[in-house]
Curated annotation (Swiss-Prot):
EC number from the UniProt entry: 1.2.1.12
CC per GO annotation: cytoplasm
CDD domains membership: GAPDH_I_C (cd18126), GAPDH_I_N (cd05214)
Species: Escherichia fergusonii
Transmembrane stretches, start-end: none
UniProt protein name: Glyceraldehyde-3-phosphate dehydrogenase
Quaternary structure note: Homotetramer.
Length: 294
């Protein structure tokens, strides 16, 4: 997904990929995607390297990031997407190998600073290793910021109805740490834990301790939804809330936070470029201080 997104940007060039898969299989996985469709471009393998749209991409299969010699291909930023090197100490091996910056594509396992577009990018101070948090946090944080900035959040609960992930089982199987997580993904709605709501408190300190949440894993291949239920400090009608979110989506958060009043369903957001889209028709208000936002 990172690779496909980068192909649409003129200011990003992929120069190297490190994976334990061989280059032929990597080319196959890039060409064909059951969820996002076929790759719109040319993909071939030559002398162990990927050639994508005529551009050569170095392919390596190193287990230790320190051996990657990123400086040989002029790497500026490494997207650390293995899910393994999620601390400053382990991710710093990429810096040792010659990279200038490292972005962890999930939450870190230590105090590596976390940045979410639309929430706290203005706090970035040049750190060489950062976390981009989770997909759920990227969905929740921009909306939570708009609501808190305009109306104040006293407290809130979040539920994410989350699409199936690769760690789940196709049929029931052993899962010693998470018994429910071991049940068949295509057969069940599976309650699960998530740290996404609490992580919002790291990127928006003013909300620290005010939000928590949980997840339901559901049998859909892509697109998840966040249900945010909050108590407001400043009373507001649902129409006022919609207006505030729409203004942000068309203003300072354009391209990050979207807004729709259409009768949409999850597949309508397959390939959506905004990290969060407010579904104006799906939310409800019990009163002017207690609302559910989707």
């Amino acid at each position: 997904i990172v690779f496909r997104a980068a192909q649409k940007r003129s200011d990003i060039e992929i120069v190297a990929i490190n994976d334990l898969l061989d280059a032929d299989y990597m080319a196959y996985m890039l060409k064909y995607d059951s969820t996002h469709g076929r790759f719109d471009g040319t993909v071939e393998v030559k002398d162990g390297h990927l050639i994508v749209n005529g551009k050569k991409i170095r392919v390596t299969a190193e287990r230790d990031p320190a051996n990657l010699k990123w400086d040989e291909v002029g790497v500026d930023v490494v997207a650390e997407a293995t899910g393994i090197f999620l601390t400053d100490e382990t991710a710093r091996k990429h810096i040792t190998a010659g990279a200038k910056k490292v972005v962890l594509t999930g939450p870190s396992k230590d105090n590596t600073p976390m940045f979410v577009k639309g929430a706290n990018f203005d706090k970035y101070a040049g750190q060489d290793i950062v976390s981009n948090a989770s997909c759920t946090t990227n969905c929740l944080a921009p909306l939570a910021k708009v609501i808190n900035d305009n109306f104040g959040i006293i407290e809130g609960l979040m539920t994410t109805v989350h699409a199936t992930t690769a760690t789940q089982k196709t049929v029931d199987g052993p899962s010693h740490k998470d018994w429910r997580g071991g049940r068949g993904a295509s057969q069940n709605i599976i309650p699960s834990s998530t740290g996404a709501a609490k992580a919002v408190g790291k990127v928006l300190p003013e909300l620290n301790g005010k939000l928590t949440g949980m997840a339901f894993r559901v049998p859909t291949p892509n697109v998840s939804v966040v249900d945010l239920t909050v108590r407001l400090e400043k009373p507001a009608t649902y129409e006022q809330i919609k207006a505030a979110v729409k203004a942000a989506a068309e203003g300072e958060m354009k391209g990050v936070l979207g807004y729709t009043e259409d009768d949409v369903v999850s597949t309508d957001f397959n390939g959506e470029v905004c990290t969060s889209v407010f579904d104006a028709k799906a939310g409800i208000a019990l009163n002017d201080n207690f609302v559910k936002l989707v």
